[in-house]
């Protein structure tokens, strides 16, 4: 076979393929010398011309926004199923006591100062500490009370008339077996003198010894019958020693309120409350969940108080009690009073600031009653409470106004 024939054989399939794809063949510069030209097309798929694609115009770029989109905002407000019980401290003559006024704490139905949900029914209050025996106090405090430190009644009167105490706390430290081991009768006599000196409600503080406190509280409850004093405090240690029942019965029989103290443990707080329910109605119980000072565990105190209040609002009946803070514990922090470097000065203000910050932190966690010491700290905390309470109920859509608020 010649080269020309071989080339023709190789070309034939290519021609057929082009004819199948394009439907036509255009030959240029080709000379064909034939007698007869025969083309055979084998049966197959019909020849279809490729579709023509229409030209697509390029999309115009999106326009830049000229204003912020408007959207409706519905502020979230919440109703809580629980409510903190109200507790009345002190009793007027019409109620069997001799106080010139009473103090009501508790009653919250929303978290502390959620004014856009509901304003607190009663403002938090401040009690000033008084001691029945000489105790070591920082100079910053002694400056204000030096003349009355040996007279609890005069000290209480100064706290009310000069420093604006809503309540007076009388700490009966002289009853401590390791200090003076004063008798319950002598302690009760001190309480009588304080009740005659002032007309505000009274908190009676023990020495911390369960056995001695139990005997003192029973005697004080009898002597101060009808005055609705707050006995501070009853503990699970008393229960374990078999002393709690006697104190609770004395409080019930003589018309007083008890302070249930536990150390940063809600389960133990609930257990103590359950034991007290056997003798006392809920409106005769206040809780002390422990106050740790700024720099010494304040964040733990804040958390436990906040958890207790939210549990109460969400319906836990065993935590629906007003809460007391022993804010004077701030002075246990050595930074509040000891001599330090110049960056810590002025020393006379450091302690009051320490006590104030401790109180304000727990105020926002829901504390209803503060035990305090320094007059400047007391005044500052009362002013803050007054400002917050004066706002009343606010509209939910204005909850961010604090960003531009001026004090």
Question: Where are these predicted regions, by residue range?
Answer:
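Acidic (Asp/Glu)-rich catalytic clusters
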Residues: 160-164, 192-197, 218-225, 245-254, ...
């Amino acid at each position: 076979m010649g080269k020309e024939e071989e080339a023709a054989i190789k070309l034939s399939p290519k021609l057929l393929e082009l004819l199948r794809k394009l439907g036509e063949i255009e030959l240029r510069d080709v000379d064909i010398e034939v007698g007869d030209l025969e083309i055979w097309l084998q049966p197959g798929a019909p020849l279809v011309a490729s579709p023509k694609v229409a030209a697509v115009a390029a999309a115009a770029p999106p326009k830049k926004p000229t204003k912020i989109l408007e959207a409706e905002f519905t502020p979230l407000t919440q109703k809580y199923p629980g409510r903190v019980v109200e507790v009345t401290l002190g009793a007027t003559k019409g109620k069997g006591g001799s106080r010139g006024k009473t103090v009501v704490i508790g009653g919250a139905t929303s978290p502390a100062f959620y004014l856009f949900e509901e304003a607190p029914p009663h403002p938090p209050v401040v009690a000033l500490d008084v001691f029945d025996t000489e105790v070591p106090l920082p100079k910053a405090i002694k400056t204000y009370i030096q003349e009355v430190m040996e007279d609890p009644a005069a000290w209480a009167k100064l706290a009310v008339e000069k420093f604006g105490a809503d309540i007076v706390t009388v700490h009966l430290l002289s009853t401590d077996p390791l200090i003076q081991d004063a008798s319950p009768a002598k302690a009760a006599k001190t309480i009588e003198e304080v009740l005659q000196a002032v007309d505000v409600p009274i908190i009676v503080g023990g020495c911390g010894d369960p056995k001695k406190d139990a005997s003192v509280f029973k005697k004080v409850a009898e002597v101060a019958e009808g005055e609705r004093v707050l006995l501070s405090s009853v503990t699970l240690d008393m229960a374990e020693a078999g002393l709690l029942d006697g104190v609770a019965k004395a409080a019930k029989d003589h018309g007083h309120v008890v302070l249930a103290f536990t150390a940063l443990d809600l389960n133990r707080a609930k257990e103590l409350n359950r034991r007290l329910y056997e003798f006392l109605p809920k409106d005769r119980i206040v809780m002390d969940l422990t106050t740790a000072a700024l720099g010494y565990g304040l964040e733990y105190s804040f958390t436990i108080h906040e958890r207790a209040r939210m549990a109460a609002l969400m319906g836990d009946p065993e935590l629906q009690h007003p809460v007391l803070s022993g804010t004077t514990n701030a002075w246990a922090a050595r930074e509040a009073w000891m001599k330090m470097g110049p960056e810590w000065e002025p020393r006379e203000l450091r302690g009051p600031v320490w006590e104030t910050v401790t109180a304000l932190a727990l105020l926002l966690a829901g504390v209803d009653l503060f035990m305090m010491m320094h007059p400047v700290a007391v005044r500052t905390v009362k002013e803050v409470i007054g400002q917050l309470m004066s706002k009343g109920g606010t509209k939910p859509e204005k909850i961010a106004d604090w960003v531009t608020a001026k004090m």
